[in-house]
């Protein structure tokens, strides 16, 4: 799968100076499956907007976004539903967890739809992220960094061609963010998938084949 932006920019960004951007309104920006991309920018530069456009939940943009040469605007609701189940996994900046459910229940809710990971595989990921003792606590009482780790585990419980990650390490310490990122890269490699990750600042501890300034 290939995602291509052609002179694309979200409409609200037209009011800003985007002259230094390596993404907005460029002739062609290509994201290829199997490759890793880190998009760096301060707040308000449209990082969430970019991922929301690619995921199909934001349509207020100028230019074109194509997936394997098919404009996203041509996709039906049914096609988008299938893509979000099989081709795109998303770690939302706001996480979108259910506070009244436990960490485990939030994860299993996704895995019950996809049946992609075994209970043992989920437990192993949780151990690697230092979350094994928090899996049966309500998501609403976990720290934001712990919630981010729950969202990461959940995102890995489905097949995907691209993983979209919106500032998913912002409240995780450097050691655990490095562990989490390596888990993500390992899963992407196993699935032959790409990752598009947004970040507020340059993360020297996170490696990527491509870095772009938004």
Predicted regions and their residues:
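Catalytic Walker B motif of ABC-type/P-loop ATPase nucleotide-binding domains
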Residues: 163-167
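ABC ATPase NBD coupling module
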Residues: 72-89
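Hydrophobic anchor residue at the start of the ABC signature
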Residues: 152
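Conserved ABC ATPase "signature" region
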Residues: 119-134
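Conserved ABC ATPase signature
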Residues: 138-142, 146
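Helix-to-loop junction immediately C-terminal to a conserved catalytic motif
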Residues: 55
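Conserved ABC transporter NBD signature motif
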Residues: 63-72
């Amino acid at each position: 799968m290939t995602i291509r932006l052609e002179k694309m920019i979200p409409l609200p960004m037209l009011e800003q100076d985007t002259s230094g951007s390596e993404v907005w309104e460029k002739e062609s920006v290509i994201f290829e499956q199997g490759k890793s991309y880190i998009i760096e920018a301060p707040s308000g530069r449209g990082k969430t907007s970019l991922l929301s456009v690619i995921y199909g939940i934001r349509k207020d943009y100028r230019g074109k976004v194509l997936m394997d040469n098919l404009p996203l605007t041509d996709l039906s609701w049914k096609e988008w539903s299938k893509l979000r189940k099989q081709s795109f996994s998303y770690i939302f900046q706001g996480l979108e967890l259910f506070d009244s459910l436990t960490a485990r229940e939030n994860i299993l809710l996704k895995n019950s739809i996809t049946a992609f990971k075994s209970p043992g595989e989920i437990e192993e990921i949780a151990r690697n992220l230092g979350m094994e003792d928090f899996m049966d606590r309500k998501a609403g009482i976990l720290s934001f960094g712990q919630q981010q780790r729950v969202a990461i585990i959940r995102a890995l419980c489905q097949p995907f061609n691209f993983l979209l990650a919106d500032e998913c390490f912002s409240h995780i310490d450097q050691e655990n963010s490095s562990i989490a990122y390596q888990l993500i890269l390992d899963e992407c490699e196993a699935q032959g998938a790409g990752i598009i990750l947004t970040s507020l600042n340059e993360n020297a501890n996170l490696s990527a084949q491509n870095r772009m300034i938004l």
